[in-house]
Regions:
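Basic, flexible Lys/Arg- and Gly-enriched helix-loop patches that mediate nucleic-acid binding at interfaces
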Residues: 1-183
Length: 183
């Protein structure tokens, strides 16, 4: 397999995110072949080296998990919440693997979310440098005027810059609501 940074080995095994894995290393919680590791960036071959976290051996042969979840309204797109509000973690209580949500939806939005322990996929799907388009079905109550549609297409100025859709298509709807396909 070759040499891999220790924090990536931990993240790939589903122990924690890379950042949290770095903190575990700095805290002295990680050993490789019986030697406590404190240095970030240390590389090992996970097929050969015995990696332990808090004295427990981790397996490098973790199978990848991909879950499709229909997030309901009223649920936060996070796996834990310090204020104990309803969140994705509540829906996954029986799952013990470390999962990442790929993207997020607002609390009052509903829709498909991908959850995985494949950190590389999650990174490629969400990091802006990969320019992966995101598609949304937007439902608004009432019939929307041409001015509102134009505002969506032209963008709006927010505190942190211009927010603009790449593509907006008005879809056939039902009386009393307007549907958009937004990219």
């Amino acid at each position: 397999m070759g040499l891999i940074r220790l924090q990536k080995i931990l993240a790939d095994a589903g122990i924690a995110s890379r950042r949290a894995s770095e903190q575990m290393i700095l805290d002295g919680r990680v050993s490789v072949d019986g030697n406590q590791i404190f240095e970030l960036g240390s590389k090992f071959d996970p097929e050969i080296s015995k990696v332990e976290v808090d004295g427990e051996v981790i397996s490098s042969k973790k199978s990848k998990i991909y879950l499709a979840l229909n997030k309901p309204r009223g649920i936060l797109s996070t796996l834990s919440d310090p204020e104990d509000r309803p969140h994705l973690g509540d829906l996954l209580q029986d799952r013990h693997e470390r999962l990442f949500h790929v993207g997020r939806l607002d609390k009052e939005s509903e829709g498909l979310l991908l959850l995985t322990n494949d950190g590389d996929l999650a990174h490629r799907a969400t990091h802006p440098s990969f320019s992966l388009p995101k598609n949304y079905l937007l439902e608004l109550r009432g019939m929307v005027s041409k001015e509102v549609v134009d505002a969506f297409r032209n963008g709006v100025e927010l505190d942190d810059g211009m927010a603009k859709v790449d593509k907006l298509t008005v879809l056939p709807g039902q009386p009393g609501r307007t549907l958009f396909d937004v990219v």
